[in-house]
A protein has these predicted regions:
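Short secondary-structure boundary segments
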Residues: 1, 42-43, 72-73, 96-98
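Short phosphate-binding/catalytic loops that engage adenosine nucleotides
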Residues: 35-36, 65, 118
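Catalytic cores of alpha/beta
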Residues: 55-92
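Conserved anion-binding
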Residues: 1-40, 44-45
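Conserved phosphate-coordination/catalytic loops
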Residues: 17-21, 51, 74
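Structural preference for beta-strand elements that scaffold enzyme active sites
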Residues: 9, 37-39, 67-69, 91-94
Length: 122
C-alpha cells in the first residue's frame, strides 16, 4: 500500500503498478472475505528506516478486527516502542535489514519493549 494524492492505494507487481483500489477499503474487504490477519507493508516507508507509517496502520486497525502486523520502516528500537505506544491495536512489528546487518539485536529490542511496558516474550 502506498500514498497517492493523500489516500492509500493498493499497488501490484512489486510496487510498480497502481491498481487504483483504495487500500483501506481493499483490506477491509479482504478481512470480510475471510483473511485472518493483515501484514501491512508501507511502500513509502519500506527500506527508509525512518519509522513505521503510523497513520496508515491506525487507519487499518480502525476497520478490521483481526491481527495487524506492521511492516516497512523500522530503523531502530525506538521505532518499535513508538509503534506499540501509538497504535495499541497493532499486534506485531516486522523488520528485516536492521537485524540482518546487525544494527539491532533481537534481545535488546525485546528488553527495551519490556522496559517500556510493552508485552513481549523474553
Amino acid at each position: 500500500v502506498k500514498r497517492v494524492d493523500g489516500s492509500f492505494h493498493v499497488f501490484a507487481k512489486g510496487g510498480r503498478e497502481d491498481t487504483g483500489m483504495d487500500g483501506i477499503e481493499w483490506i477491509r474487504r479482504c478481512v470480510d472475505n475471510g483473511a485472518g490477519e493483515v501484514v501491512l507493508n508501507s511502500i513509502d516507508t519500506d527500506g527508509v528506516k525512518n519509522g513505521f507509517d503510523l497513520e496508515m496502520l491506525q487507519a487499518v486497525c480502525d476497520v478490521v478486527n483481526v491481527p495487524v502486523i506492521a511492516s516497512g520502516g523500522a530503523g531502530g528500537i525506538d521505532h518499535f516502542v513508538e509503534l506499540f505506544r501509538a497504535i495499541p491495536g497493532v499486534d506485531a512489528g516486522l523488520a528485516a535489514s536492521i537485524f540482518h546487518f546487525g544494527e539491532v539485536e533481537i534481545r535488546d529490542l525485546k528488553e527495551e519493549l519490556h522496559r517500556n511496558g510493552i508485552n513481549v516474550r523474553l
